[in-house]
A protein has these predicted regions:
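Short, flexible active-site loop motifs that bind/organize anionic cofactors or intermediates
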Residues: 9-13, 45-46, 81, 111
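A broad "ordered helical/assembly scaffold" signature
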Residues: 10, 22, 26-28, 35, ...
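A glycine-centered beta-loop-beta connector
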Residues: 27-30, 35-54, 95, 103-119
Length: 147
């Protein structure tokens, strides 16, 4: 099975200068835990990703104002990505290695085409046993990364 078979196509995205308040509202509306960050409006060139964890650790816990804090201040830059034609096992391995729950999917020119989340693999993936192992590994406690 390939990444393109289970990814969510054309996910909502934001730009580095968006406020984290706006992104949090998009997360709520879309019922997602992460938003890919694209270079600029009308561009799908991936430059980062922002997660609900980033919001909790680097905005709320640090007492920052969500309306004046930009995505670029708290996002993960150059996240690990996969391509639609890569085997799903690559995404599973990356999730386990990097302890991430979501992986942006980009074409060969770096344009965002989708995203894979743990839930996508659990509900659509063929390798449910490996997915369960990966979720267990990802869920182990880790230290907070510096912004």
């Amino acid at each position: 099975m390939m990444c393109g078979d289970v990814m969510t196509k054309d996910p909502a995205c934001c730009v580095p200068t968006d406020s984290v308040a706006r992104v949090a509202k998009v997360m709520k509306t879309q019922d997602v835990g992460s938003i890919p960050v694209c270079e600029r409006q009308n561009s799908r060139k991936l430059v980062g990703i922002i997660t609900d964890r980033d919001l909790a650790l680097h905005v709320v816990a640090e007492g920052r104002d969500a309306n004046s804090t930009n995505v670029q201040d708290v996002m993960t830059r150059e996240p690990f990505t996969c391509h639609p034609d890569e085997d799903l096992q690559s995404a599973l391995n990356a999730m386990q290695l990097y302890q991430v729950r979501r992986i942006p999917i980009v074409d060969r020119s770096g344009q965002l085409v989708g995203i894979i989340a743990q839930a996508d693999m659990a509900t659509r993936g063929a390798e449910r046993e490996k997915t369960a192992e990966t979720i267990e590994e990802i869920s182990k406690p880790s230290t907070a990364r510096a912004a």
